[in-house]
Amino acid sequence: MQTNDKKVLITGGGSGIGLILAKTFLNAGSKVIICGRNLEKLEIVKQELSKIEIAQCDVTSDEQIKALLEQCKEDFNGIDILINNAGIFNIFDYQNGKLSIEQQVKEIDINLSGALKMVHYFLPLLLEPKEAAIVNVSSGLAFVPLTAAPVYCATKAAIHSWTRSIRWQLKGTRIKVFELMPPLVDTSMVQELKGIPKMQLDELATKFMMDFKHDKFEITPGPAGQLKMLSKWAPGFIFKQLNKNI
């Protein structure tokens, strides 16, 4: 997949994986638009990266997604690459009841339904360029769940299954469908998890871009590849190893 002169839209682009991908695509010659719920956070990024474009959008809102779609049409004459990265990560135990059902449903709405909505509304626009791509960010935890984050892992497993399906459905089009499956990455989202190794953002971005340019549709940086393999060959062992300190 080429990156030069491509127009890239990244959800959840104000921090973490979304932001490092934005920087990576900028360095690769792409025009980058990041969106997120927190406009103040996006404006801070804009101050640092003047070439980046920002747009406020909550991916759980159909109306805000439609408005973002119109903005991409009018201001950028479409997009070439959609990266569904927006997500939240909640650690909780059902026995203590500290996370409300509303918070659990919100995690599903952002992590899973948000990506579905973005593809639903943006697909016609992505069918226009000669070459386009959808990148869904799931997780190595799609293969082996971390029991401390049950809803997060369930949403990422669903993203993995859904991505395989839409890749198959779109194989006769000009849209390439990628899935980035990171291991735990050193971001503020998972700072509550102690004692578990985390991948550095720049290392993740380097691996992603190398595989993206070579059309490797399932990208498993670092330990994520091991999780995927061991989930097939030794599922009980790797599940216990991952969760032994939880």
Predicted regions and their residues:
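The beta1-alpha1 cofactor-binding region of Rossmann-like NAD(H)/NADP(H)-dependent oxidoreductases
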Residues: 57-67
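Conserved mid-core segment of classical short-chain dehydrogenase/reductases
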Residues: 66, 89-105, 148
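Residue(s) in the substrate-gating loop at a strand-loop-helix junction
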Residues: 139
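Active-site helix of classical SDR
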Residues: 119, 155
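Conserved glycine-rich Rossmann-like NAD(P)H-binding loop of the short-chain dehydrogenase/reductase
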Residues: 28-43
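C-terminal helical subdomain
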Residues: 179, 187, 191-232
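Conserved glycine-rich cofactor-binding loop
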Residues: 12-16
